Amino acid sequence: MTILSAITSISRPNKSSKSVISSNGGSSLSMGSNSVSCFNACGGGSSYSYSSSYSGSGLDYSYKANYSSSTGYNSSVIIASSTCHCS
């Protein structure tokens, strides 16, 4: 499976950045790949959260995730595109 990702530069003072992740054939992506993309977009901070939604081919996906250095991951489902909120 080929995973393509593009991370745009931080465009808002509140350190909110956007990460776009896609996969061939709508295959699900691993939590690890998503986390790394958001982690890098946030500059490697100790915590972040992001959410996304995707609609295509009659299927709707949604994904929400939170990461904290003290509690670890809290995540679910599939991600196609996301907005990272850095803290």
Swiss-Prot record:
This protein's name: HssA/B-like protein 58
Taxonomy of the source species: Eukaryota, Amoebozoa, Evosea, Eumycetozoa, Dictyostelia
Region span, Disordered: 1-31
InterPro entries membership: HssA/B-like_chaperone, HssA/B-related
Stated family: Belongs to the hssA/B family.
Signal peptide: none
Ranges of compositional bias, category Low complexity: 14-31
Residue spans of biased composition, Polar residues class: 1-13
GO biological process, one term: sorocarp development
